[in-house]
């Protein structure tokens, strides 16, 4: 009987701790997003302005084009999740300063959406092109896309003999 009461007490205590964590899905997704956000901003800043036109082979994007792509995609996903799609048009920019400003603007948009999205709100459906997805899907996809693109940026940095931020912080 003592074992049963001990187990029951432990379960009750654990369920209370879980209940105290509001929005566990969005909280965990935001943690992942926040880590990658820091890495992307540091990577964009770390690459010298004169190397924003660098591309390892002729058939891939330049470093600057990757930054623009990240900013444009992020703005699309996050503003779409908010229900008010915004076109950033970072692809039209070429200088490091302008591209960094676009990247920061896309993160500002995403920060607001992540802050306002609870687990319940995340289940709401939104139109994405010809499909419908949950707001959670849009924010998850934005975060996964950031992760993928960061991997490319890390290679570009290494090819320029620069240490990627995620490695540097270890």
Which residue stretches match the model-derived regions?
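Iron-associated oxidoreductase/ferritin-like identity signal
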Residues: 20-27, 86, 95, 99, ...
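Generic structural signal for well-ordered secondary structure
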Residues: 22, 33, 59, 70-71, ...
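Short, contiguous alpha-helical
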Residues: 30-31, 38-41, 51-89, 127-170
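Surface-exposed helix-capping loop/turn segments at secondary-structure junctions
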Residues: 46-52, 114-122, 158-164
